[in-house]
């Protein structure tokens, strides 16, 4: 069996180190930096010939820099005769650009990124909670899309929730919310119906379901500016919700997110470590982070040993 080796770019160094610790190994020796003109510089400083290589790199902000680091690392490892290269992308950037809106002259950038990764020599992709699962079909290589929900659910069960109800922040998240509700002792579910007049701005319209006197658990795959989340929490509290907790896998937290969360009525926001948090976000008392390092380490181990990934999520 080829030697398994882990490498990491500069996007998620702490998560990469946690994964390495879980696998009782160390991160590979690679210098990933910049030339004086800002171009990505990569040098692999150890033998990888024939190795089973995993590169851990979220393509979060700065998205283009992190994406270029990833593809240049793949090329360096491919030219060094690596046996198999798996791109471990905890947060897959550009995933929201997954379709062309009718009559709009826009790209399908998620497909562009998939082609880019395939063209430089990625053999397999491991990612977490793709914004749209059909993005897997954009790739010409196998994609393992694992779920953060077991980690989030385990934390929810520790909250001692009072008459809980799972809330989907929009119609598109109903499937995710229903799955969480079923696992959370088959609890009830509510849906927030909203309109989005422009990007990153949403207006809550009404709530489908009775939330009065109940602990509400909002679930989503990501939090961007937090505007949608904060308006949803306000609507829930206005309709009598007792407490509001928000759970999401990917903490993008762009723009005015810190200020939005600081002034929000949300009791607690719980996210995963697929994207590093800024110091400002870390300082907020109502934001808490869970690690996916154990789950990702197990997925990497299974891929390396040619074992089933889907078996990790069988209940």
From Swiss-Prot:
Record bears the keyword Metal-binding: yes
Phenotype of gene-disrupted mutants: Cells lacking this gene are unable to grow on nucleosides as purine source.
This protein's UniProt keywords: Allosteric enzyme, ATP-binding, Cytoplasm, Kinase, Magnesium, Manganese, Metal-binding, Nucleotide biosynthesis, Nucleotide-binding, Transferase
Pfam families found in the cross-reference section: Pribosyl_synth (PF14572), Pribosyltran_N (PF13793)
Alphabetical list of InterPro entries matching this protein: PRib_PP_synth_CS, Pribosyltran_N, PRibTrfase_dom, PRTase-like, Rib-P_diPkinase, Rib-P_diPkinase_bac
Effect noted on mutating residue 220 to E: 4-fold decrease in the affinity binding for Rib-5-P in the presence of magnesium ions. In the presence of cobalt ions, it shows a 15-fold decrease in the affinity binding for Rib-5-P
Binding site for ATP: 37-39, 96-97
Binding site for Mg(2+) 2: 170
EC number(s) per entry: 2.7.6.1
Stated pH dependence: Optimum pH is 9.7-9.8.
Activity regulation details: Activated by inorganic phosphate. In addition to form a complex with ATP, Mg(2+) also acts as a cofactor. Strongly inhibited by ADP through competitive binding at the activation site and at a specific allosteric site. Competitively inhibited by Ca(2+) and ribose 1,5-bisphosphate (Rib-1,5-P2). Less strongly inhibited by AMP, alpha,beta-methylene ATP (mATP), (2',3'-dialdehyde)-ATP (oATP) and 1-alpha,2-alpha,3-alpha-trihydroxy-4-beta-cyclopentanemethanol 5-phosphate (cRib-5-P).
Reaction(s) catalysed (UniProt annotation): D-ribose 5-phosphate + ATP = 5-phospho-alpha-D-ribose 1-diphosphate + AMP + H(+)
A molecular-function term among this protein's GO annotations: phosphate ion binding
Subcellular location: Cytoplasm
Note on cofactor: Binds 2 Mg(2+) ions per subunit. Mn(2+), Co(2+) and Cd(2+) are also accepted.
The keyword Metal-binding belongs to this UniProt entry's keyword annotation: yes
Pathway where this protein functions: Metabolic intermediate biosynthesis; 5-phospho-alpha-D-ribose 1-diphosphate biosynthesis; 5-phospho-alpha-D-ribose 1-diphosphate from D-ribose 5-phosphate (route I): step 1/1
Main location as per UniProt: cytoplasm
Residues binding D-ribose 5-phosphate: 196, 220, 224-228
Family to which this protein belongs: Belongs to the ribose-phosphate pyrophosphokinase family. Class I subfamily.
Subunit structure and binding partners: Homohexamer.
Name this protein carries in UniProt: Ribose-phosphate pyrophosphokinase
């Amino acid at each position: 069996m080829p030697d398994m080796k882990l490498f990491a770019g500069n996007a998620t160094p702490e998560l990469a180190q946690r994964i390495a610790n879980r696998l009782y190994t160390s991160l590979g020796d690679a210098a990933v930096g910049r030339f004086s003109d800002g171009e990505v510089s990569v040098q692999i400083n150890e033998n990888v010939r024939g190795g089973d290589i995993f590169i851990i790199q979220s393509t979060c902000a700065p998205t283009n820099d992190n994406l270029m680091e990833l593809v240049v690392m793949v090329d360096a490892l491919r030219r060094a005769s690596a046996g198999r290269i798996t791109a471990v992308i905890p947060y897959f950037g550009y995933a929201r650009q997954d379709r062309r809106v009718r009559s709009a002259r826009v790209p399908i950038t998620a497909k562009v990124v998939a082609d880019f990764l395939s063209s430089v020599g990625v053999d397999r992709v491991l990612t977490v909670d793709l914004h749209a699962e059909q993005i897997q079909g954009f790739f010409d290589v196998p994609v393992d899309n694992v779920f953060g929900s077991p980690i989030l659910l385990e934390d929810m069960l520790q909250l001692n929730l009072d008459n809980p109800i799972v809330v989907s922040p929009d119609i598109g998240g109903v499937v995710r919310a229903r799955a969480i509700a079923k696992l959370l002792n088959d609890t009830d579910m509510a849906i927030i119906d909203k309109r989005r007049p422009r990007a990153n701005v949403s207006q809550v319209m009404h709530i489908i379901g009775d939330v009065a006197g109940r602990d509400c658990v909002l679930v989503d795959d990501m939090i961007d500016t937090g505007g949608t989340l904060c308006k949803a929490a306000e609507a829930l509290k206005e309709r009598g919700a007792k407490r509001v907790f928000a759970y999401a896998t990917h903490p993008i937290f762009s723009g005015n997110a810190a200020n939005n969360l600081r002034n929000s009525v949300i009791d607690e926001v719980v996210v995963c470590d697929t994207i590093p948090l800024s110091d400002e976000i870390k300082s907020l008392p109502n934001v808490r982070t869970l690690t996916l390092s154990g789950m990702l380490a197990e997925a990497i181990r299974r891929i390396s040993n040619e074992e089933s990934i889907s078996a990790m999520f069988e209940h």
